[in-house]
């Protein structure tokens, strides 16, 4: 198991009458982190997954009694895949307001979906954390600084999703990356309602892959893909919100 820097921060963030929202890409280790948190807490805890219909329906009820039955006599309620719950922000607000002696954690992979649903109702009621693939510091802490430095090229080429880091065989790493891209990263985008040309996002990613670390022209991207600049900007925003890309703004002293 790779020790994650975020674990002690989550432990200290658990406060009665408050919520914690944990965002991160799929397969980055959020559920594993939550399980480690469970193993290290003395609080009576209920862990539920919104992948299960019965929990999804209860969490979407906006009914104090239904939500109270879900919490029962637990001191900490953890909701995994919370973005799948309709009006999750409002229902979390009800939980936080109506059950001030309990603490709550909600995790989600599609940050845009979860953020839009939780930010306004939970203003002042939550702490927000972002979980990313394993950092070089975490690798060094787990495997030792010498091994981390020796394997630096490997991390740079293959990336540092936890399963990729722990897999020793290159063919298996390649298979895992293919599944990760096809089954998880694209899914959040391609299942979006109103996304009229999902194939254009895939084409956009291919173009961006050749420009990593370089200045990117939205006008050139729009011309290459035969779509307007506003659509390119929207697609880039979506890609950033589901953790596929990270935009680095140009440096300027004239702020």
Where do the protein language model's features map onto the residues?
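Short glycine-rich substrate-engagement loop in P-loop NTPases that contacts/grips substrate
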Residues: 45-76
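Short regulatory helix/loop adjacent to the ATP-binding pocket of P-loop NTPases
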Residues: 112-128, 143
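Conserved catalytic/switch belt of AAA+ P-loop NTPases
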Residues: 89-112, 119-121
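Hydrophobic positions on the alpha1 helix immediately C-terminal to the Walker A/P-loop
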Residues: 33, 37
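Pre-Walker A adenine-sensing motif
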Residues: 1-14
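Accessory nucleic acid-recognition modules appended to NTPase machines
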Residues: 14, 170-255
């Amino acid at each position: 198991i790779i020790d994650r820097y975020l674990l002690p921060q989550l432990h200290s963030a658990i406060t009665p009458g408050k919520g914690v929202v944990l965002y991160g890409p799929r397969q980055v280790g959020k559920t594993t982190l939550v399980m480690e948190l469970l193993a290290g807490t003395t609080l009576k805890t209920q862990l539920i997954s919104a992948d299960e219909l019965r929990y999804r329906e209860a969490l979407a009820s906006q009914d104090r009694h239904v939500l109270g039955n879900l919490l029962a006599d637990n001191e900490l309620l953890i909701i995994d895949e919370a973005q799948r719950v309709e009006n999750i922000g409002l229902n979390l607000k009800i939980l936080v307001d109506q059950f001030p002696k309990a603490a709550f954690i909600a995790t989600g992979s599609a940050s845009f979906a979860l953020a839009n649903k939780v930010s306004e109702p939970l203003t002042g009621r939550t702490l927000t954390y972002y979980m990313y693939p394993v950092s070089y510091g975490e690798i060094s802490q787990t495997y030792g600084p010498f091994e981390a430095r020796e394997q630096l090229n490997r991390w740079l080429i293959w990336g540092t999703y936890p399963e990729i880091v722990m897999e020793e065989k290159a063919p298996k790493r390649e298979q895992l990356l293919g599944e990760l891209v096809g089954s998880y990263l694209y899914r959040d985008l391609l299942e979006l309602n109103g996304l009229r040309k999902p194939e254009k996002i895939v084409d956009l990613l291919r173009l961006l892959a050749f420009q990593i670390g370089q200045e990117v022209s939205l006008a050139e991207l729009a011309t290459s893909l035969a779509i307007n600049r506003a659509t390119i900007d929207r697609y880039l925003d979506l890609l950033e919100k589901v953790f596929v890309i990270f935009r680095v703004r140009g440096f300027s002293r004239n702020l």
